[in-house]
UniProtKB/Swiss-Prot annotation:
Biased composition (Polar residues): 41-53, 62-78
Statement: the UniProt record of this protein carries the keyword Magnesium: no
Biased composition (Basic and acidic residues): 21-39, 121-135, 253-266
Protein's recorded name: Remorin 4.1
Organism ancestry: Eukaryota, Viridiplantae, Streptophyta, Embryophyta, Tracheophyta
Tissue spec: Predominantly detected in bud, stem, root, flower, silique, and leaves, and enhanced dramatically in senescence leaf.
Induction: Induced by mannitol, NaCl, drought, as well exogenous abscisic acid (ABA) application.
Length: 296
């Protein structure tokens, strides 16, 4: 049997108003010492939670526990403790919901785990979010009430952690495989695109060379035809020039001949006139007028 000394609320303070009681719920009321006997194997003892791991390594008894008693003071304190724990659980749950989208990022995931661990440590509910990387130590509190499946629960938590780690590793591996496949597909597409573009460029270069050859051939043919026409024109010009010169020479010769003929005829007529004039002088007879019918 263990004898404990507790505190009960005095009847004098129970008659205060509801507002004053709610404002001073967390304060220590005036009390008197009451002696209670607690037996080890009864149901009226404190219901303690399994020990959680402290900051110094090793399991420590929880800082808060729910005590069941018949007194008014114990019921008020338990109601306050349950309300605080419920509020802390609600805050922790809202933090978990608000940060559920950022669990894939390492920094955000660590911050969420740290916040949840702090909240659950503050209310004494950090059994499920403890440090799974270290080996828990044995319980040193003989009065702690441990559930029957406590060891199995630790093993299940470790299995859950390992399963989550394995799932994350599988997700990372799947993401890596998908990234490698995507890079391989991108490399194939790039190689195909490069080959097609090179083929099109080579085809265009061949067509350009053919077009340039055809253009050069057409230009050469046009120049050859022009030169041929020029040569023909030169020949025709030479022939025309020669023909023109021949015609000019022939005209000149004919002109000379006609001039000589006219000159001879003139000389003959002048000599005949002079002879008739001399005869008329000698006879002394003037020239007679010619009639219309006279012959010259």
């Amino acid at each position: 049997m263990l004898t404990l000394y507790g505190q009960e609320r005095s009847p004098e303070n129970s008659t205060t108003s509801t507002t004053d009681a709610s404002d001073r719920r967390d304060e220590t009321p005036s009390s008197e010492i009451v002696v209670r006997d607690i037996h080890a194997m009864t149901t009226t003892t404190e219901l303690t939670r399994p020990q959680q791991r402290g900051s110094g390594g090793g399991y420590l008894s929880p800082s808060r526990s729910i005590a069941f008693s018949d007194g008014t003071t114990s019921s008020g304190e338990n109601f306050t403790t349950v309300s605080r724990e419920f509020n802390a659980l609600v805050i922790a749950g809202s933090s978990m919901d608000n940060n559920s989208n950022g669990t894939n990022q390492s920094g955000g995931h660590r911050d969420v785990i740290r916040d949840e661990r702090n909240e659950l440590t503050r209310i004494g509910e950090n059994d499920d979010v403890g440090d799974h990387g270290q080996v828990p130590e044995e319980d040193s509190n003989p009065w702690a009430i441990v559930p029957d499946d406590y060891n199995n629960r630790d093993g299940s938590e470790n299995n859950i952690v390992l399963a989550s780690s394995g799932g994350q590793n599988r997700m990372v591996t799947t993401a890596s495989v998908q990234r490698v496949k995507r890079e391989e597909v991108e490399a194939k597409i790039t190689a195909w695109q490069t080959a097609k573009v090179a083929k099109i460029n080579n085809r265009f270069k061949r067509q350009d060379a053919v077009i340039n050859g055809w253009l050069n051939e057409q230009v050469h043919r046009a120049n050859s035809w022009m030169k041929k026409i020029e040569r023909k024109l030169e020949d025709r010009r030479a022939k025309a020039m020669e023909k023109t010169q021949n015609k000019v020479a022939k005209a000149q010769r004919k002109a000379e001949e006609r001039r000589a003929t006219a000159e001879g005829k003139r000389g003959t007529e002048v000599a005949r006139v002079l002879e008739v004039a001399n005869l008329m002088r000698a006879v002394g007879r003037p020239p007679a007028k010619r009639s219309f019918f006279s012959l010259s």
